[in-house]
Amino acid sequence: DGQIPIQLKLGAARVYDDVRMAAKTGCDSIYIDGMEGGTAAGPHIATEETGVPGIAAIRQARNAIDDVGMTGRISLVYAGGIRNGGDVAKAVALGADAVAIGHSSLMALNCNKDIPEADYPAEMGVEAGECYHCHTGRCPVGVATQDPELRKRLDPDEAAERVYNFLHTLTIEAQLFARACGKTNIHSLEPEDLAALTMEASAMAGVPLAGTNHTVGVEDYHHL
């Protein structure tokens, strides 16, 4: 009935084919999770050795949406490794309509922070900054837990202010990135505003190597 937006979330794997199929379902947006995404509940082999990098996933997803004629009708949301405004701006330039943020917001909440109330070695068997035990429900800073005593370690008002400051700063950084590219709106960013520093990045993102007009994998190569 058009009252509730429907979003499909996909892990970045066979991105182009998956997004093409998803786009035909009539959903409102497609959420792509790149391999850079952080989670404390997944095994190391899954979080570090599987998935498709964001710069490749975004371009493939955008091409898929465009190719099925759903441009402007289905929004592309990207998540995975968004840590600062530069990450946001680059994702938008590559074709994302929006980004989603998870792990970095947890950091702003106090995740993994060495606070006086938390004894990481005694409580978790690890040092502060190396916790990653969200799934156990024993979060020493009170973020990922339902334990009443542990929850007291998190001040909701202070935590909300930290998250606000993080998101506000991230927004300002993204705007500065757009201005540096001569754009008045971050959504005006496009691939031509980017340059790749490695051959791999050029091939995956479909943008020229810095200082050249050459995009790896594209035959028409012209020297500046």
Which residues does each PLM region occupy?
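Glycine-rich phosphate/ribose-binding loops and adjacent secondary-structure elements
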Residues: 1-151
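C-terminal extensions of enzymes
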Residues: 147-224
